[in-house]
Amino acid sequence: MTSVGVPIKILHEAEGHMVTLETVTGEVYRGKLSEAEDNMNCQLAETVVTFRDGRSHQLDNVFIRGNKIRFMILPDMLKNAPMFKNIGRAQKGAIGMGLGGLDQRGRGRGTAFRRPMGRGGPRGMSRPGGAPTFRG
């Protein structure tokens, strides 16, 4: 079982509030988010749907499948949700770490500036494009 990410947690926090969402077909739904699932399936109550041609219609309840949602507009009050405070603490520890974070050992062999070995023999036995070295 995988844990849900912060965007899905924020979506669950928006339950009971007015949200606006647009589907991939271009309809815009505005209503009270009754229920949201981890796969972004949403149930809206007291909804106004605006179709692509500009017509609008009032609906009591509507269920929208999660993979048909293009984007959602959530209430501004969710900016103060506790999940964002936890993210802020986690990012403070990562400032200045670069892309890889703390542990960079063992992440590759760094062969960009090493001389080529030849045909795979041990070091010193062959040179690229030439005969083996002779030390006599």
From Swiss-Prot:
Biological processes annotated in GO: spliceosomal snRNP assembly
Main location: nucleus
Subcellular location(s) per record: Nucleus; Cytoplasm, Cytosol
Keyword annotations: Cytoplasm, mRNA processing, mRNA splicing, Nucleus, Ribonucleoprotein, Spliceosome
Physiological role: Plays a role in pre-mRNA splicing as a core component of the spliceosomal U1, U2, U4 and U5 small nuclear ribonucleoproteins (snRNPs), the building blocks of the spliceosome.
InterPro entries: LSm4/Sm_D1/D3, LSM_dom_sf, Sm, Sm_dom_euk/arc, SmD3
Protein name: Small nuclear ribonucleoprotein Sm D3
Organism name: Caenorhabditis elegans
Gene Ontology MF terms in the entry: RNA binding
UniProt region (Disordered), positions on chain: 98-136
